[in-house]
Amino acid sequence: MADVKKIATRESYGNTLKELAAEGHEDLVVLDADLAAATKTGMFRKAYPDRHFDCGIAEGNMMGVAAGLSTMGYVPFVSSFAMFAAGRAFEQVRNSIGYPHLNVKIGATHGGISVGEDGASHQCCEDFALMRSIPGMTVICPADDVEARAAVRAAYAMEGPVYLRFGRLAVPVFHDAENYHFEIGKGEQITEGSDIAIIATGLMVNEARIAAEQLTAEGIHAQVINIHTIKPLDEEIVLKAAKECGKVITAEEHNVIGGLGEAVCAVLSEKLPTPVRRVGVQDKFGCSGPAWDLLREYGLDAATICKTAHEMLGK
């Protein structure tokens, strides 16, 4: 594939918050937990200091503050690393935001093992599972800059709690901003194919695209599906892909327990039993190292997707 521009989706998050405020959305406020430089909400703080609240390293309290602001008509975007937003503050997200179904948006950056050198303590590979388990919570993981920007706008526009996962790592921008349409709960078919379906989310969507290109050169035609909304899952596109291909691979930068793979398996086991293999973190903790090296080490790459396809197809 030709070289393309790379942007971290956390950058997309910060940029879009600033754009929304500039467009006159005065109800939008941003909260952070002493991480504005890393979550990229610092650019919002610089432009709108009276609408940015640094709650310090007290993520649970920050969720409570956001809940209170939402009851007064504001639309809070609460920002922290995924490990702290979904992990440390889970009780407050569940009880203060999820239970009353408040209009709070959680911008969780640094998701997955691509956090890199910070190591296992900061590499959250369990956030999909945690957030999916909260009734009424929408869970989104965009694949690139274009999709991330659209996701932030869609989250702002909808009523109810939303968990958005963004990455630290700069990833290729493959969507065309001019022609891209984003809809919460609707997947996107990226390539045609009838031999095997690859259903991916986040940075694994581009790896699925690369894998599909390599498989095509071998005469294997893979259908790539981008699932940006983990919950509610687009069951229609999953069932269509399974019916057309007969074999499914899921790919995610998350533990294979509780994430996209299990969500897909739940749908297929009940409605269209289909062989499925899950590419993801195989029930392990992360470790410290350069992000791309870790992705390869944990099998979160195009090579692993291709290998899995060969095994499923017996080729």
PLM features: what roles do these ranges have?
Residues 1-165, 170, 181, ...:
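Thiamine diphosphate
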